[in-house]
């Protein structure tokens, strides 16, 4: 029988209690004279998955990176409006390292650190002094088990992460993000370079993480948004065009731009084409 993990309180997965709510309020973003996104107001309910859809250049990735303040040091970046986390502006003068413990991020391509597999997982735990060194392996085992990677790496925790496959590296990066117990997890096309098996595994993890986290994910994959999203927001040419429950947005879009973008996913009148996909939306919500 598998022994129960005894994690330090600071790194034990919290019991969902309402958690944080992130909110963008009249947010305008730009770089120099160019405005990338204009007057976006959008709520992210606690313990839910919100997917951000839109064509390339619509502003959704700039928006996502702003939620983590990743754009702060980009030349010419400017913003007006606000983003609130737990009712407090994220743009206040604050410790960005501590802020990013609360708002984690997983990128399109895996970015393991040049250190051992175990040290990767506990990097944030060590930096934030969330657990004593003697408990690092316990923390690493818990998070690697959660993402389904423990059995593959348990005998090679001292190895370089660059010896892992691309999919395994992405799972390692997810374990690292989860090890510090963020309130919000931002995902920037996290499966775009992965094989179907790993993609399915990560999508399942996203759904299970929504039991305790606020998850916000950029994706270009309509089917992925349908499978994972509780809510979906559609961006087009620097505007938030439409947002709402994923089922409603996929089956009953209200704006012309949304209808056109979702057309390949929705069956034509009197046709069965795409019916399995739209049925999946209806059944998953």
Curated annotation (Swiss-Prot):
EC annotation from Swiss-Prot or TrEMBL: 7.3.2.1
GO biological process, one term: phosphate ion transmembrane transport
Sequence ranges of Polar residues compositional bias: 272-285
Protein name, per record: Phosphate import ATP-binding protein PstB
Membrane topology: Peripheral membrane protein
Cellular component aspect of the GO annotation: plasma membrane
Keywords, ordered alphabetically: ATP-binding, Cell membrane, Membrane, Nucleotide-binding, Phosphate transport, Translocase, Transport
Domain named ABC transporter: residues: 22-262
UniProt-annotated location(s): Cell membrane
Binding site for ATP: 54-61
Species of provenance: Mycobacterium intracellulare
Stated family: Belongs to the ABC transporter superfamily. Phosphate importer (TC 3.A.1.7) family.
PANTHER family xref list: ABC TRANSPORTER I FAMILY MEMBER 17 (PTHR43423:SF1)
Principal subcellular localization: membrane
């Amino acid at each position: 029988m598998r022994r129960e993990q005894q994690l330090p309180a600071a790194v034990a997965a919290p019991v969902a209690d309402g958690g944080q709510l992130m909110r963008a309020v009249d947010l305008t973003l730009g770089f120099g004279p160019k405005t990338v996104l204009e007057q976006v107001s959008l709520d992210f309910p606690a313990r839910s998955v919100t997917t951000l859809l839109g064509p390339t250049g619509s502003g959704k990735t700039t928006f996502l990176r702003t939620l983590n303040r990743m754009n702060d040091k980009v030349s010419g970046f400017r913003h007006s409006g606000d983003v609130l986390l737990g009712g407090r502006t994220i743009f206040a003068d604050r410790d960005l390292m501590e802020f990013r413990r609360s708002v984690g991020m997983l990128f399109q391509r895996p970015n393991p650190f040049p250190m051992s597999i175990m040290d990767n997982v506990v990097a944030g735990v060590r930096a934030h002094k969330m657990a004593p060194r003697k408990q690092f392996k316990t923390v690493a085992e818990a998070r690697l088990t959660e993402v389904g990677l423990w059995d593959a790496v348990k005998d090679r925790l001292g190895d370089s992460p660059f010896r892992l496959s691309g999919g395994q590296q992405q799972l390692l990066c997810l374990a690292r993000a989860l090890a510090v117990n963020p309130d919000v997890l931002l995902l920037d096309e996290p499966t775009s370079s992965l094989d179907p098996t790993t993609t399915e595994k990560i999508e399942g993890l996203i759904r299970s993480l929504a039991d305790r986290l606020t998850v916000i994910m950029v994706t270009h994959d309509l089917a992925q948004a349908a499978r994972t999203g509780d809510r979906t927001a559609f961006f087009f040419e620097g505007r938030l065009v439409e947002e709402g429950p994923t089922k409603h947005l996929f089956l009953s879009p209200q704006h012309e731009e949304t209808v056109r973008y979702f057309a390949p996913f929705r069956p034509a009148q009197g046709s069965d084409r795409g019916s399995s996909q739209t049925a999946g939306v209806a059944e998953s919500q």
